[in-house]
Regions:
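Loop/turn elements at helix/coil->beta-strand transitions in domains of secreted/extracellular proteins
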Residues: 32-36, 63-67, 115-118, 145-149
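Structured beta-strand-rich core segments of catalytic domains in phosphoester-bond hydrolases
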Residues: 42-117, 210-216
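Extracytoplasmic/secreted proteins, especially bacterial periplasmic and envelope-associated proteins
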Residues: 20, 24-27, 31, 53, ...
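Metal-dependent phosphoester-hydrolase catalytic domains
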Residues: 96-98, 128, 140-150, 157-243
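Active-site neighborhood of phospho(di)ester-bond hydrolases with catalytic His/Asp-centered motifs
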Residues: 37-40, 69-72, 150-154, 178-181
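Active-site-proximal beta-strand elements of phosphoester/diester hydrolases
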Residues: 1-12, 95-97, 111-125
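N-terminal, active-site-proximal structural segment of metallo-dependent hydrolase catalytic domains
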Residues: 1-61, 75-77, 232, 239-243
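Catalytic metal-binding/acid-base residues of hydrolase active sites
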Residues: 4-6, 42-43, 123-125, 155-158, ...
Length: 243
């Protein structure tokens, strides 16, 4: 799964940092029961945000036993901002690392290796050339493994853009789009920039793909609620089965 948190400020027209907004974001992850999720727009130690560790706060609010992997990509108000990954400890995490990516802002790639697959989480830059270069780096990282690799994140790029975008012509040399592309931004219903991609690394039969979706409504305790006020992005999930 991939989900841009919008720094858990809420998408109500008056963004504000609050515990309630963090809990609202976390309950989406809890309700979907994501095994592993790439999250973008996280902060840690920022003076104007009570020095919170947002990824840890999200993990705690889900009540799920997640391992937390944060990638400090750029300085922000005495702390750091960047992407991160929550991964259930039950998946059997073998290793984690971060890889620096180019950009006008600091950018990072989170790498989580489990027994059965590798998961890459990121938030690519707005600069076209930086995204192209990042795509090459990501392909190289994927090629370093002998097991299936998933790439999830806010790619700030779309396969539907002119020329196929900046990153996708490079990424699709290794990866295939496996997530739903029905529109991932509440404010731009036809725009898709949040993706989950797959590189089989020569093992095309290692994974069964069961279901995918962009979640725009969710049932919380019997009540269906719109998710367009939780964040300025919708969560995107991919349900798989390892063979």
């Amino acid at each position: 799964m991939t989900y841009n948190s919008y720094y858990c400020r809420g998408n109500t027209g008056t963004p504000a940092v609050s515990q309630t907004n963090t809990e609202n974001f976390a309950r989406v992850i809890k309700t979907l029961d994501a095994d592993i999720v790439a999250i973008q727009e996280l902060d840690k130690g920022a003076l104007n945000r009570n020095k919170r560790d947002l990824l840890q706060e999200i993990a705690d609010a889900t009540g799920i036993d997640y391992q937390v992997v944060f990638a400090p990509a750029a300085d922000y108000m005495g702390g750091k901002i960047g992407p991160g990954v929550l991964v259930k400890r039950s998946l059997g995490v073998k290793s984690t690392k971060t890889v620096e990516l180019p950009g006008d802002e600091g950018r990072m790639l989170v790498v989580v290796e489990t027994e059965g697959f590798v998961f890459l989480g990121t938030h690519l830059d707005l600069n076209d050339e930086a995204r192209r270069q990042s795509a090459t780096i990501i392909n190289d990282v994927s090629n370093g493994y002998r097991k299936p690799v998933f790439l999830a994140g806010d790619l700030n790029d779309s396969h539907r853009w002119s020329g196929g975008g900046a990153a996708f012509p490079v990424l699709t040399n290794e990866f295939a789009i496996k997530s739903s592309t029905e529109g991932t931004l509440p404010g731009q219903p036809n725009e898709t920039i949040d993706y989950i991609l797959f590189d089989d690394n020569g093992q095309p039969s290692a994974v069964n793909f069961l279901e995918t979706g962009v979640v725009k409504k969710l049932n919380f305790n019997g009540k269906v609620e719109d998710l367009d006020t939780v964040s300025d992005h919708f969560p995107v999930y991919l349900d798989i089965e390892l063979k």
